[in-house]
């Protein structure tokens, strides 16, 4: 009987291939482990004082009444959930930060989840003077009424009611004068892209903000595409003045169609006076006027034929000592004039009263431990 001898060359080949695969896998695992250890060491060395994560919730609940010429508007009266938002922000590296804020109370069938996202952007700071941001951010338009966060809005002008201020885009910022002044250039989606029904419409914005002893300007020049290839020009001048416990702002905005420039035919003026009676109580008075007498259509925010005024006031009470995260408010305003937009927010002979409770809750905060 013939003896069968093993094929040592075949066995040797199989063993060599197995050893090669094993060594390759070990090298890959070692490389991954080395990268992770390297990143960890770099993080520990450079991110000592960084905030990794802040997580919080913003909430506001109101009871309100609205009347038109003395007749109650039932659908806009009663208890209302005005704001329910969550936010995350922090540092990914010493030069790279992130911010995310989602409004949970904007759940409309014609909106996506991303439509209810206020902020979702990254900011890169190569130096202490230059900032580069990209993502969903506020359209950079001047004015202090426009600059209000949704949770702080009580009653606003027709212009501010009709502009979709959170859009995708990119911006570059330069800080100067000991960081007291900032210039921002921004390229983003048009705030009127939904009205134009064109995603491919844009806004080009240049914003200057400053902080001086008693004066804080918030000015901008904007070229806003309201229809495909058609632009509005904004000149928005926000001016904040502070004197002790009293402060007030005056916003002046002129709007004109680029093909037919005009001055003070289409404009909005807003003024607000605020006074801190004590650490717990603040009162304010506010008025706005929207005006558009341009014959041709073009401005989607304040339509032709509009000349409408809103005026009112209110108070804010902060129960916590040296903390304004919890707030109780009561406001009242009246509106009179004509609105060229039949579906506009401001209506002639409109009366509005509102009381409510809002609070800001910082639920979690993680910081990188300092290296000992």
Model-flagged regions — what are they?
Residues 3, 18, 22:
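Cationic, low-complexity basic patches in intrinsically disordered or flexible, solvent-exposed regions
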Residues 30-39:
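Sec-dependent N-terminal signal peptides
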Residues 43-49:
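Boundary at the C-terminal end of the N-terminal hydrophobic targeting segment
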Residues 49-62, 75-190, 209-211:
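Outer membrane beta-barrel
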Residues 58-74, 110, 121, 125, ...:
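Outer-membrane beta-barrel pore domains
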Residues 184-233:
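Loop-centered beta-sheet repeat module
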